[in-house]
Regions:
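Short conserved AdoMet
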Residues: 80, 138, 152
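P-loop/Walker A phosphate-binding loop and immediately adjacent motor/lid segment at beta-alpha junctions
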Residues: 146-154
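Conserved beta-strand signature within the Rossmann-like core of class I S-adenosyl-L-methionine
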Residues: 154-160
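Conserved N-terminal segment of class I S-adenosyl-L-methionine
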Residues: 1-127, 131, 144, 160
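A short His-aromatic
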Residues: 132, 136
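A short, conserved alpha-helix within the catalytic core of class I
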Residues: 137-147
Length: 160
């Protein structure tokens, strides 16, 4: 079994080989069950951004909005009017933030490539959303710790 520290629960026990495809080997943590790759398979920041630059997600795309409704609707149903939110990993065409703004919420966005403003982490929010982001992070534990610190007590973190 390969030795690797789980990037989510930080377990340093042996991980189980989960899957191999034509590009990389995947491991699974014995404790939290996270499936991850070892650092040797990480993309450089330039490679990662180049891939994201090919995404065609837009707030005007009804199919993309329908896809995001799986996260938007359950969160929206639990919010008080005029709640404040953060869309973490908003991408080149922020859409979740637009959807929440359309129904009266105040939104901040963060994306390390397209909206890299770390001052958004100086605030506390009623809700935080992150869609198609966490699975791309090299250190998801650090991201979750940061997001939890930015949430007001008892508030919502929506991950898709």
């Amino acid at each position: 079994m390969p030795a690797a520290v789980c990037p989510l629960c930080l377990n340093n026990h042996h991980s189980v080989h989960f899957l191999q495809d034509d590009r990389r080997d995947y491991l699974q943590c014995q404790d939290c069950q996270l499936i991850f790759v070892s650092p040797e398979y990480f993309l450089s920041a330039e490679e990662e951004k180049a891939r994201y630059d090919t995404h065609q997600n837009s707030p005007q795309d009804p199919r993309y909005r329908q896809f995001l409704n799986r996260l938007f609707l359950p969160i929206q149903q639990q919010l008080s009017p005029n709640s404040s939110g953060l869309d973490f990993g908003s991408g080149p065409g922020p859409t979740l933030s637009v959807m929440f703004e359309e129904v009266g919420h105040q939104m901040a966005i963060y994306d390390r490539f397209y909206a890299d403003d770390p001052t958004v982490f100086d605030y506390r929010y009623d809700f935080i959303t992150t869609s198609e982001t966490i699975e791309h992070l090299q250190q998801p534990r650090q991201a979750f710790d940061l997001l939890w610190r930015c949430l007001k007590p008892g508030c919502l973190l929506g991950v898709m």
